[in-house]
Amino acid sequence: MQNTWKDIVKDFPTTPFLFVGSGLTRRYFDLPNWEELLKHFAAIISDDSFIFQRYMQENDKDYEKIGSAISKDFDSKWFRDASIRTNEEDVYAAVEAGVSPFKAELAHFIKINSIKNEAYAEEIALLQKLTENNISGFITTNYDTFIEDIAAGYKTYNSQEELIFSPIQEMAEIFKIHGSVTDPASIVITAEDYQEFNDKCAYLAAKLLTIFMEYPIIFIGYSITDNDIQKILSAIIACLSKKNVDKLQNRFIFVKRNAAITDDIKIGTYSKEINGQDIFMTQLETNNFKLIYEPLTEKQAAMPVKLLRFFKDQFYNFTLTNQPSKHIFVNAFDPNVPLDQLCCSIGQNSQLVKRGLVGMSLEQCYKAIVFDNIIPFSADDILAFAIPNLLSQTSKLPLGRLQVQIEQDLSSNYISGIHLIKKSVEQFIRSVVA
């Protein structure tokens, strides 16, 4: 094993994904955990100090079943007793749309209590900085919007279903597999919700498999025995051979909060049997998460991850539809051209596209001018960039159409306060060819 956390990060093949649990939300937002959240809503149903203990006993201390019982009782009381309703538009709108009042109120409760803990301001700022160039993406079971708040520009998938049915780029993305407060209906909290989640877990695992095999995964804010982690890992392990399972050891990093360690990181190995196979992962123990984040600044993507995702998304859509967009221009090329002679240019489209006009063929020019073929160039652009090169090949170019277009554009000698001097097309051509 490497000597330090910095050494481990240095050996990462790429920037990591962070798998974020409720522990991070508790740390930075001081929000309640699962049990505390259920207790809060149980207390709204009844002022009996033993109400939650009753739910615990009647449901075998199973939080999923307790969630179902509280949801049923809360919804019933919410419709009968207006005094327990939160008089806010987002709550009423959600209920009117068919969302359970329990989930609508829960989402609102988390929203209004999501206040950053200033004691961890430096940690939060450092983590936010990492989202620019040092983290590939996030996977989380949290409902709150902490990650979206710090990772501006990331694409967010607000539910397991949305993730399963969407093309993902594995870059600058947030996968909220248990739902989000921005969509209360998506929140997974009852036994029925979890059953539906488990039924689709194999599909989710298939969607995440490439990420788990190609990216380092840092689990943070979870207990190592967390059921959510166990279920997802179990579904993923079921897809892998022992050889590939063994590869996960160097890619799985588990951060364990240890209140006694404040100025160092204790590095060890943790093993867990899943599906009959021993899974090993690197374990980091500390209560100073700055020590976790700082070495990650040394592992950078080639360019900001938001841009990388944008490019991947554009190429994916073009490959899928064969339709260029305002962000991607694809010129016809000989399929027999060696790959090492092809290039991809990235830059401001207004400049790159005009440079591409220099290589316009005669056929393309005729189509653009005579048939108004759809090309996003002005007559000025064609004259300035394409015509000089084409005139060296032939003098028979249909320039009249360009002249008409230019004269229409210059119908006034003044545009935006700038005095324009009219010239004939012939004069313009002579000036650009000279």
Regions from the PLM with identified roles:
Residues 221:
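Active-site loops and adjacent core secondary-structure elements that bind or stabilize anionic groups
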Residues 210:
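Short acidic alpha-helix that forms the nucleotide-activated donor recognition element
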Residues 1-189, 213-215, 224-227, 232, ...:
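Conserved catalytic-core helix/loop/strand module for nucleotide-ribose chemistry
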Residues 122, 192-207:
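Active-site glycine-rich loop that binds ribose-phosphate moieties when present
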